[in-house]
């Protein structure tokens, strides 16, 4: 009887551990490094911290992660397309200067474009400047927008 209880307790513990998500990592990107490569290498749930600097990028985020600026880094789309395009749910963007989207009304170019299905995005404390649309949200639910300029 005791061995059965011990086995059940061990199975319950193993099942609870299997259900736990792996610990999220924090990746730090410095000016001059490839920000898109860092985002692609990140696992869902990770945080990518972007240090102060100028990044010429049309960033695509297709997994749940946090992109956090450290010291207000500037992400410039180079006046082509979207500066940041979010296609996954549960993405957090905070502390960034996002600028220089493209100018196509047909394509709805934006500094930050939240695509259909990118539910529960959080856009917090960013400066959106020199963009056709600072922030464009299309068919995404429960998006939080706080303290942006």
Where are these regions (language model features)?
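Extracellular beta-strand-rich solenoid/capping regions of secreted or surface-exposed proteins
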Residues: 36, 40, 44, 54-68, ...
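Extracellular beta-strand repeat scaffolds in secreted/surface proteins
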Residues: 46-50
């Amino acid at each position: 009887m005791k061995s059965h209880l011990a086995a059940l307790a061990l199975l319950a513990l193993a099942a609870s551990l299997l259900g736990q998500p792996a610990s999220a990592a924090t990746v730090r990107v410095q000016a001059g490094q490839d920000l898109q490569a860092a985002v692609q290498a990140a696992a869902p749930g990770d945080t990518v911290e972007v240090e102060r600097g100028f990044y010429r990028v049309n960033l695509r985020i297709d997994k749940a992660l946090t992109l956090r600026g450290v010291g207000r880094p500037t992400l410039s789309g180079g006046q082509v397309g979207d500066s940041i395009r979010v296609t996954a749910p549960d993405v957090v963007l905070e502390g960034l200067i996002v600028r220089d989207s493209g100018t196509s009304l047909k394509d709805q170019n934006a500094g930050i474009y939240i695509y259909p299905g990118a539910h529960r995005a959080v856009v917090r404390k960013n400066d959106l400047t020199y963009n056709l649309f600072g922030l464009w949200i299309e068919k995404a639910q429960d998006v939080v927008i706080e303290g942006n300029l």
